């Protein structure tokens, strides 16, 4: 990817972009599925971009990974013991799940190059893949779920936005297949984009899950390097979801966050009603 005067920019629209001053471009490759770029930035450390969009930075990755793991961890009927992660090739979600004490984690990533880049440049995140409790599978997550005959307490959709290889991860057919592999009291969670800049992604996830699951909720969090800094997640279960009192804290997550993330601004409520 070509830089302009040592700046990497993620374009949100024809009129708006977020730019990071870059000290070095560490990697730029085209895989069978997408383009991967790795930059060393002045303010956020190493930055991983896929198809020109920020996936994570060293400085704020913990926020996203705690939100996509620690919130659903506390929404299952009982403390979960197993999880399926679709996407998440950087290893961040799996690492957080290990910290939460899960006994079995299956991580299915379609693009093996994402894993290799993470092993090379984000060793703390990718260290999860060396743990015997984690089974890393390089495969299409949609196909894996379709043929899966295991049950999981948590299913985490840690994907890119609903286009390209990730488009099918927001489909009714995929959500229907998920219902067959969730254990009693289990939950599914998916990142669902910026309510401000990507309202269609949120509506797609919410309406799809709403047709198949009895209880569906949206929660949000602050992620500085994502579009608008305001990000959504959609969580669903066949059972009523009531948060269990947390016995742990993260760097971002605590008891107040668990309560507060479900308090939605009116414009977000309007999107999903």
Swiss-Prot record:
The active site is at 158 (proton acceptor). Residues 5-238 form the PABS domain. S-methyl-5'-thioadenosine binds at residues 34, 109, 140-141, 165. Its main location: cytoplasm. It holds the Pfam family Spermine_synth. Keywords: Cytoplasm, Polyamine biosynthesis, Spermidine biosynthesis, Transferase. Pathway: Amine and polyamine biosynthesis; spermidine biosynthesis; spermidine from putrescine: step 1/1. Gene3D superfamilies: Spermidine synthase, tetramerisation domain, Vaccinia Virus protein VP39. Belongs to the spermidine/spermine synthase family. Catalyzes the irreversible transfer of a propylamine group from the amino donor S-adenosylmethioninamine (decarboxy-AdoMet) to putrescine (1,4-diaminobutane) to yield spermidine. This is Polyamine aminopropyltransferase. It comes from Thermoplasma volcanium (strain ATCC 51530 / DSM 4299 / JCM 9571 / NBRC 15438 / GSS1).
